[in-house]
Swiss-Prot record:
Its main location: cytoplasm. One of its GO terms (cellular component) is cytoplasm. ATP binds at residues 14, 207-211, 282-284, 329-333. It comes from Brachyspira hyodysenteriae (strain ATCC 49526 / WA1). GO terms for biological process: acetate metabolic process; acetyl-CoA biosynthetic process. Coiled coil: none annotated. Pfam families: Acetate_kinase (PF00871). This is Acetate kinase. Its EC number is 2.7.2.1. One of its GO terms (molecular function) is ATP binding.
Amino acid sequence: MNVLVINSGSSSIKYQLFAMPEAKVLAKGLLEKIGEEISALKHTAVEKGKEKKIEQKVADHKAGMSLIFSLLTDKEVGVIADMNEISAVGHRVVHGGEAFNKSILITDEAIKAIEACCDIAPLHNPAGLQGISACKEILKDVKMVGVFDTSFHQTIPDYAYMYAVPHEWYDKYKIRRYGFHGTSHKYVYGEFCKVTNKPNANVIVCHLGNGASVTAVKNGESIDTSMGLTPLEGLVMGTRSGDMDPAVPTFVMAKENLSAKEMDNILNKKSGLLGVSGVSNDMRNLEEAAKTNPKAELAITMFCYRVKKYIGAYMAALGHLDGIVFTGGIGENSAYIRGRILEGLDELGIKCDADKNSKARGCANFEKDGAAIKLYVIATDEEKAIAMDTYNLAK
């Protein structure tokens, strides 16, 4: 059974075709700059070892999906004979609100519920809906599955997800913590439990990339997470501010005569590591720049300090901790950042072995010998997780 996984952005489509249930990747690709004068698509037929790059105008998501399907069935770089060989499509949907606590088969009712969340996810949900609509038009009767970034966090208790603001805001607008990166947090937590042979372990998962979040998982359930109503809350991120005094935006808006939309854009796209350093939102660039640039060093220190604080807070929330897992682009690839975050936590039982840490890749532990709290790097695979959920619902 072949499952196509789609991740639709506002101007991009990322895709992978899996042979299930073994989760073997047959083909993958990325289409960018949809709607611009020249769009770019990079397609790889994995087993054939063949790659094709296309640059042409792609007007919208439907045209993009048509182009992707033509490559999947192409004589040279295709991996299937025709579209009938696709049994199901799994869609990443960023925000499911309170409507979805697990992955679902997409129905007309489900689409309405996803549309209802566009208010609180204006950057992401409309794009996801465009991908769903394009696939439904082209593939007609093929089963579609929605996998939500928020659903894993629906187990968070009310005292952790409610904000201390007038309750009517929740009643009217469902203002609360939702959390994101749920598919990644759930996947790497499951991998940790497998490799340590500790089912239902208590784990802190640090998904650190351009977007970053920390989740406390107790007995297999998310009990708290750093992102909030939107992905803007929590850690210092590539271009997002993370936690701050809510009075700051209104103060600066008055001083600079900024609209709410302008301030939202600054906090989401011009803050975080980029805003503090003035250099880059990319941690690799900052690690290099920090050798001579104090602002780059400050940005790194703020990033690591914020993660460290969340680890301490979530240790308190969990009561007992079995392990800490690092994943995401930074979490998986920067031993330096992992080391900085875990520095000085020995008294809490968190003991990082510097030598093991420097070599940790893919799936590897790096705590000191005999330490009770396990430290792991585990590569995330959200596409595989989406494919598994899609297969289980559609088979």
